[in-house]
């Protein structure tokens, strides 16, 4: 992969390190704010190619051949034909996932690799049986259940790489990465890595402030966003004995110990490492921060995405940042969420989602100066969860969730072109009065009553940022009814 800079051809790895050696200025709004490519630059109107309604839509992943998307759907999963991105078509809908004869609910994550699909849940404690189920999706229109594995912990997220499944395993006592072999007729645990075994001091902090939220894996390295503890790089070349490599963090254990209110620590910046992944080369890492204004000290704003040079994985260097869209009420309860959610780095492009702030494409070939190529949002109807590139490289899929507090949204899978452009007449995020159907009022600063976060009680004492009042929703029918009412929130 090469960059062409003023007539000089330079390998990306060399460029990333050279840019640091040249003495980059400290990160600031002026030095890292994305440059915008507009229609005036010769680009056209940007809009979705197509969409498909999916009740309970959450995480979406793309199949290896680019013709199928798989969508977690809270009470099950859906397979979608996206061979023609302009006409996404339902292939199969499975709403009867079971572990040990009991229904698996609050399914917010799926992962696919080749003909294997893994469904995991529940994303929170208090939703009944927990575990993973593997399917054969060699025929995506007819998924076949192969094996299941019951766990004694909820599963917020997972990722499948070949025959290995990497699972986030959080309890009050531990926040582990657990690795399974799913290649045979039975699923078997191989090994694990524990933050608290390495740094026991984090055990003094509220579990949610050190929560292992997600996992991505590339070239035998796992990238683990441990909320305020930071993002950890772990060598998983030996899945029976994972080993620490390094980590990056925006806050310290001492600073976290000084925060009196767990809500301020968990919902507000700094920290909030929510999702982390690297590009195709493994040289550029992005860390998304899911955060809201809490009424506390600065920074009182939604979370963005930070970009790190990891050409030397033992010595990460922060290079740039992509800031979130801003809105009139940036509190959790306000429902106008524009914080970073999931994303994909592919071929010097970052495909990102920002809930009601929409979807974006950035050119990150120079990570110190991300260049925005496209942005589309419809906050009256959508809240985007993730973006995943199809194998053709000509389109990407993005799932939209209905489960944002105090809203009336619809779950769906959207398809978008991979091209630069500007949306025609987008709705204003800063002035939502004309389109906002929420019943709550707003305020200019995001401070005050609307910044009150969820009550921390779910029977187990183990609640996750973004989930509120849902512990009793164990059955599929009740969970779907809850989603339709949008009285609570499902947040990944």
Model-predicted regions and their roles:
Residues 1-492:
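Hydrophobic alpha-helical segments
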């Amino acid at each position: 992969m090469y960059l062409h800079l003023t007539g000089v051809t330079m390998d990306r790895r060399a460029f990333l390190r050279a840019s640091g050696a040249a003495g980059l200025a400290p990160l600031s709004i002026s030095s890292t704010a994305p440059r915008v490519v507009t229609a005036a630059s010769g680009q056209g109107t940007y809009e979705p190619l197509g969409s498909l309604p999916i009740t309970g839509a959450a995480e979406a992943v793309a199949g290896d051949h680019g013709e199928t998307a798989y969508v977690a759907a809270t009470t099950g999963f859906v397979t979608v034909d996206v061979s023609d991105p302009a006409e996404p078509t339902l292939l199969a809908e499975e709403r009867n996932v079971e572990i040990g004869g009991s229904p698996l609910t609050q399914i917010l994550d799926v992962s696919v690799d080749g003909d294997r699909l893994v469904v995991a849940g529940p994303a929170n404690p208090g939703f009944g049986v927990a575990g993973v189920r593997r399917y054969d999706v060699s025929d995506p229109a007819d998924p076949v259940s192969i094996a299941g594995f019951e766990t004694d912990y909820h599963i917020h997220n997972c990722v499948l790489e070949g025959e290995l499944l990497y699972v986030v395993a959080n309890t009050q006592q531990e926040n582990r990465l657990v690795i399974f072999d799913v290649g045979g007729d039975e699923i078997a645990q191989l090994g694990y890595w524990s933050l608290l075994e390495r740094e026991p001091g984090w055990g003094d902090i509220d579990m949610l402030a050190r929560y292992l939220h997600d996992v991505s894996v590339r070239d035998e390295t796992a990238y683990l966003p441990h909320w305020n503890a930071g993002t950890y790089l772990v060598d998983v070349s030996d899945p029976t004995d994972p080993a620490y490599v390094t980590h990056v963090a925006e806050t310290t254990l001492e600073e976290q110990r000084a925060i009196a209110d767990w809500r301020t620590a968990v919902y507000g910046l700094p920290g909030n490492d929510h999702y982390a992944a690297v590009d195709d080369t493994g040289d550029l890492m992005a860390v998304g921060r899911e955060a809201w204004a809490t009424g506390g000290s600065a920074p009182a704003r939604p979370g963005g995405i930070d970009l790190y040079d990891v050409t030397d994985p033992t010595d990460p260097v922060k290079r740039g940042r992509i800031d979130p869209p801003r809105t009139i009420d940036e509190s959790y309860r306000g429902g106008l969420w524009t914080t970073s959610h999931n994303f994909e780095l592919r071929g010097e492009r970052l495909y990102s989602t920002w809930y009601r702030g929409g979807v974006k494409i950035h050119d990150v070939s120079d990570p110190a100066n991300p260049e925005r190529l496209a942005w589309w949002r419809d906050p009256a109807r959508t809240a985007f969860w993730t973006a995943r590139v199809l194998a053709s490289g000509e389109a990407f899929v993005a799932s939209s969730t209905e489960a944002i507090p105090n809203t009336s949204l619809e779950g769906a899978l959207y398809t978008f072109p991979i091209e630069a452009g500007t949306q025609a007449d987008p709705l204003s995020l800063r002035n939502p009065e004309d389109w906002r159907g929420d019943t709550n009022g707003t305020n200019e600063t995001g401070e005050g009553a609307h910044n009150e976060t969820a009550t921390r009680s779910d029977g187990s004492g183990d609640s996750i940022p973004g989930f509120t009042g849902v512990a009793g929703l164990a059955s599929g029918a009740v969970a779907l009814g809850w989603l339709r009412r949008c009285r609570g929130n499902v947040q990944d």
